[in-house]
Amino acid sequence: MTSSRPVFRSSWLPYVLVLPQLLITVIFFIWPAGQALWYSVQNLDPFGLSSEFVGMENFRQLFNNPYYLDSFYTTLIFSFLVAGFGMLISLFLAALVDYVIRASRLYQTLIILPYAVAPAVAAVLWMFLFNPGLGLITHFLGLLGYTWNHAQDSGQAMFLVVLASVWKQISYNFLFFLAALQSIPRSLVEAGAIDGAGPVRRFFNLVLPMISPVSFFLLVVNLVYAFFDTFPIIDAATAGGPVQSTTTLIYKIYREGFAGLDLSSSAAQSVILMLLVIGLTVIQFRFVERKVNYQ
């Protein structure tokens, strides 16, 4: 029995091959994370030239700050809305395209197009559509007697950023769901139909369990996307307003760290956000993965 493990002539060659990736990880991930941990227990001046060790004081001030707690709850609500609706809509579209025989390539192309749009551009696009004075969608809403102004209404502002974020992420989810659906053997689906199972029953009892690994992967990816990668959308669409109703944790870190030059507070918020994402990921792997069928 032969081993498939590669054998290197030089003992140092494997380390040289891994070195570039290790350097990238250390420089762009481990070193910034270590700096954030260090700054979170320091009281830094606005330019970072002098510091004083304060222990957990920065964290205590954060959890006694009602504005920070509001942004914490806003982040949780926003993230679950983006991840939930993004995955449901993508799965629905993928199932429709997988079912359609004619012009399926055209539908795939149209659905994938938003993936090529930059997040800030996606936000501006939806801002124009929902512009209170010139927007096409707001014009039809006005005909129905509904007044739209996301610059003054917190609920409308949240709807706008969730809509733009979901629209931007649909293409990514769609590609994975469609590939998973097309990998299911047609013989299994046909056998279920012969046994008398209807389309809905076949989907929930046969198709959905078979694509559960992809669904679990996308759940993790979408939550991380909602926590971090939606910053350009929020910044371009609402800038965290009105009255901080769309200020998520990542945007609050930017506002206090880069705009307000409060490096200690922003570092403490970065640590909390990092721990929150790690905690949610561990929970998903600990409990949600149990229901994933890899067979």
Curated annotation (Swiss-Prot):
PROSITE patterns in UniProt: ABC_TM1
Family under the similarity heading: Belongs to the binding-protein-dependent transport system permease family. UgpAE subfamily.
GO cellular component: plasma membrane
Matching NCBIfam families: PRK10561.1
Domain ABC transmembrane type-1 positions: 76-284
Parts of the chain on the Periplasmic side: 33-76, 131-157, 229-262
Bilayer-crossing regions: 12-32, 77-97, 110-130, 158-178, 208-228, 263-283
Function: Part of the ABC transporter complex UgpBAEC involved in sn-glycerol-3-phosphate (G3P) import. Probably responsible for the translocation of the substrate across the membrane.
Keywords for the protein's UniProt record, in alphabetical order: Cell inner membrane, Cell membrane, Membrane, Transmembrane, Transmembrane helix, Transport
Keyword Transmembrane helix: yes
Segments in the Cytoplasmic topological domain: 1-11, 98-109, 179-207, 284-295
Chief location: membrane
Taxonomic classification: Bacteria, Pseudomonadati, Pseudomonadota, Gammaproteobacteria, Enterobacterales
Pfam families: BPD_transp_1 (PF00528)
Membrane topology (UniProt): Multi-pass membrane protein
Gene of this entry: ugpA
Keyword Transmembrane: yes
Biological process terms in GO annotation: transmembrane transport
Stated name of the protein: sn-glycerol-3-phosphate transport system permease protein UgpA
Assembly and interaction partners: The complex is composed of two ATP-binding proteins (UgpC), two transmembrane proteins (UgpA and UgpE) and a solute-binding protein (UgpB).
InterPro entries per the UniProt record, alphabetical: MetI-like (IPR000515), MetI-like_sf (IPR035906), UgpAE/MalFG_permease (IPR050809)
Cellular compartment(s): Cell inner membrane
